[in-house]
Amino acid sequence: MPIVVSDYKAPSWCPGGHLQTVLPAKLMPRPKVSYRREKVEMPDGDFMLWDWVEPEVKDVTAPILVHFHGLEGSSRSHYAEALMASCVERGWRGVVAHFRSCGGEMNRLPRAYFAGDSADCEWVLKTVHRRYPTADLRAVGVSLGANQLAKFLGLSLIHI
């Protein structure tokens, strides 16, 4: 693989990739997001915590964005709040589906989530679709959540 030479120079006040990653997350204003929490019972006897945002004017056909967070992320992660605020601005519903034992409450079963596990991802998407069959369903994942979503979509014959 060839080495790509770049003439990019980091600003003197913000050298290095670590600082360039951390500063925006800490210094940028965060949108105010109000969630409605739902504890959803799962077929295996466990539960998931879902944090919903909804526009003031509710349209049953409005798109729904399902967000799968990163490792130990939650609906309070800066990226989740920004994404859910954007949903509300567009008139969409949005839901952050917390993986097991994320979202501030330990689960009942001794089952954890991991990057290669797409079963819960599949269950979430199918459950949301059953509840809102006329809504356009969309999904996004960040980091670990993106891996689970990509695995599910790659193995699935379902068009999402």
What are these regions (language model features)?
Residues M1-M28:
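N-terminal presequences and immediately downstream first alpha-helices
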Residues L23-V57:
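N-terminal cap/lid segment of alpha/beta-hydrolase-fold proteins
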Residues W52, Y79-A80, N107-P110:
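Short coil/turn segments at secondary-structure boundaries
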Residues P55-G103:
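Short, surface-exposed "cap/lid" segments of acyl-processing enzymes
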Residues A82, K151-L155:
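Active-site signature of alpha/beta-hydrolase-fold catalytic machinery across serine-
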Residues S86, C102-R138:
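Catalytic nucleophile-loop/oxyanion-hole region of alpha/beta-hydrolase
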Residues G141-K151:
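Glycine-rich nucleophile elbow surrounding the catalytic serine of serine-hydrolase chemistry
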Residues I158-I160:
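Conserved small/polar residues in nucleotide/adenosyl-binding loops
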